[in-house]
């Protein structure tokens, strides 16, 4: 059973953790918490800049007690999250190298990164927004969440591993025998610094025995941008509480234009769906949206689950959609 602990103050949460006992085999896990903010402040009016290769970047001034250059470390990955204002919930990838070359108080944003939730932004909409600079989660950081520790092996079939979903399937990253290096089949590269974005979860493949996994951090106190793609995609809710499909926004006619909306159908294969990994079965349980655009069911059942807390912070799930929605927002549930 997952364990959630949460300590807060009258203004904002101080700390939280999501803990779960994982058995040998496959188990899903999401990462709903954020690391402590490295910098918080107010965004100013940005100007255009370029990186060292001439690629377009946004140079954003931030009014804060510290400077971005004082907290960014070369070789590490960070993002800027909008915590208040017109663009609340948006996450914009930080170009660290370019940021360190800018004037004091500025950060370079890479809107071309697939991890940025906006590909373009107006200066007026970002100006005066409250923002936070946050470090990304990596495979190495996930490795540090286990007790007892993960056990590596140079034989991928014997090593503890993490499965990451992309491009229509899972890629397995396994821990090598040095218990430091992460590889995937057919590659000699070290993937320990590979980023797991806030909207992603992973499947954990344990071969060395049961372990306790503890994800510690701070609860997100702003809405969460989750851009929807057509087809299958991994997803997280962004929050360390169980939520329902209704809270997730998985109903029709709730705001998006028809070409970006959820699609319901009484035939499961033709309906949008959510697939949640069930470690007890070693497979996914599928839920689908009915033609009324509101009712969520599983195959062979007439029970309506729209208001049931199916989406949990310590689980892995996929979303299947006919339509993309590049402006999908999960509203903060607390």
Q: Locations of the language-model features?
A:
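Charged, amphipathic alpha-helical scaffolding segments
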Residues: 173-218, 286-334
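Short conserved beta-strand and strand-loop elements enriched in small hydrophobics
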Residues: 75-85, 131, 160-164, 272-276
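Long, low-hydrophobicity ectodomains and other hydrophilic envelope-associated domains
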Residues: 24, 30-57, 157, 171-172, ...
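Boundary/junction segments of secreted and surface-exposed precursor proteins
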Residues: 2-41, 141, 213-232, 327-334
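Surface-exposed loop/edge segments in extracytoplasmic proteins
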Residues: 87-93, 168-173, 281-286
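Extracellular structured ligand-interaction cores
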Residues: 26, 91, 159-160, 197-201, ...
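Autoprocessing Asn-cyclization modules and mimics
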Residues: 8-124, 135
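Surface-exposed interaction/gating patches
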Residues: 140-165, 220-284
């Amino acid at each position: 059973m997952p364990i959630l602990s949460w300590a807060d103050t009258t203004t904002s949460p101080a700390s939280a953790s999501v803990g779960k006992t994982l058995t040998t085999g496959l188990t899903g896990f999401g990462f709903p918490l954020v690391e402590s903010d490295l910098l918080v402040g107010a965004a100013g009016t940005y100007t255009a800049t370029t990186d060292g290769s001439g690629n377009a970047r946004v140079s954003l001034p931030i009014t804060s007690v510290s400077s971005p250059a004082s907290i960014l470390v070369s070789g590490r990955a960070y993002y800027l999250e909008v915590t208040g204002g017109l663009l609340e919930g948006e996450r914009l990838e930080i170009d660290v190298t370019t940021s360190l070359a800018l004037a004091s108080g500025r950060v370079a944003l890479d809107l071309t990164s697939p991890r940025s939730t906006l590909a373009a932004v107006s200066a007026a909409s970002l100006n005066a927004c409250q923002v936070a600079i946050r470090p990304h989660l990596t495979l190495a950081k996930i490795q540090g969440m286990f007790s007892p520790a993960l056990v590596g092996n140079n034989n991928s079939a014997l090593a503890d591993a993490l499965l990451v979903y992309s491009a229509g399937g899972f890629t397995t990253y396994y821990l090598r025998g040095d218990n430091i290096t992460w590889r995937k089949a057919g590659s000699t590269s070290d993937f320990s610094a590979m980023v797991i974005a806030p909207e992603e979860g992973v499947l954990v493949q344990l071969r060395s025995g049961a372990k306790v996994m503890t994800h510690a951090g701070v609860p997100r106190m702003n809405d969460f941008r989750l851009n929807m793609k057509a087809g299958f995609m991994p997803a997280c809710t962004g929050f360390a509480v169980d939520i329902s499909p209704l809270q997730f926004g998985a109903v029709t006619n709730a705001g998006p234009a028809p070409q970006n909306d959820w699609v319901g159908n009484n035939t499961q294969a033709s309906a949008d769906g959510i697939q949640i990994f069930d470690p007890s079965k070693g497979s996914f349980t599928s839920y689908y949206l009915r033609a009324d655009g509101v009712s969520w069911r599983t195959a062979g059942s007439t029970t309506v689950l729209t208001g049931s807390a199916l989406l949990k912070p310590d689980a892995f799930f996929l979303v299947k959609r006919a339509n993309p929605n590049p402006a999908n927002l999960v509203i903060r549930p607390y």
